[in-house]
Amino acid sequence: MICKGSSRRLPQKNRLDLNGKPMFMWNVQKLLRIAPRVYVSSDDHWILDEAEWAGAIPIKRPSELCGDTPNIPVYQHALQFMNGVSGIIAVQANSPTIDSKLIETARELLDRGYNEIMTMHEDRSIYGSIWALSRKKLENYKDFYNPKPEVLLLDPSTDVHTKKDFDEVQKICQKYSSSPR
């Protein structure tokens, strides 16, 4: 998981309290129930400490990969700390309403030999709340701004960028309180 400490539109959005826990923690907890190892890459020490306390493996992101950096170089950096993995399933920190079943589906597709799986909106535009990549595909990725997923999965979750998005997600998450989907 990539989890920046700052955000232009909604300051420190990943750290915002979402029904009793930082927003990013909703997906960390889902991933910890699904995957044997969960990695969190961040430029924020507090986020890394919280992730480690929850059971994830923290990866300190170097300054050259902070700011408006495409995700692929950040994933490639994180891959250096992941021994023996055949691929990654990256889940956005700011999409706390992702259904864990969708994450599991991405993992199953990766295990079946697909090299790139992403989520999409209902209008079929690429969303990327989940981005699964085989190790080989990730290591050899050419165009960071032009993903070519083999499989697109429909994801109705909300991506939080603004206070309005956060308020919407807060209402949804109240239904799940301490047990995220």
Task: Describe these PLM feature segments.
Residues 1-11:
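N-terminal nucleotide-binding beta1-loop-alpha1 segment
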Residues 3, 42-43, 92, 120:
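Short beta-strand/turn micro-motifs composed of small residues
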Residues 5-7, 64, 93-96:
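Short glycine-rich anion-binding loops that position phosphate/pyrophosphate groups of nucleotides
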Residues 9, 48, 98-99:
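Glycine/Thr-rich phosphate-binding loops of Rossmann-like dinucleotide-binding domains
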Residues 10-32:
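Short, well-formed alpha-helical segments that are part of the catalytic scaffolds
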Residues 25-84:
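Conserved N-terminal catalytic core of the sugar/cofactor nucleotidyltransferase
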Residues 53-54, 69-77, 84-87, 92-167, ...:
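Conserved core of the sugar-phosphate nucleotidyltransferase
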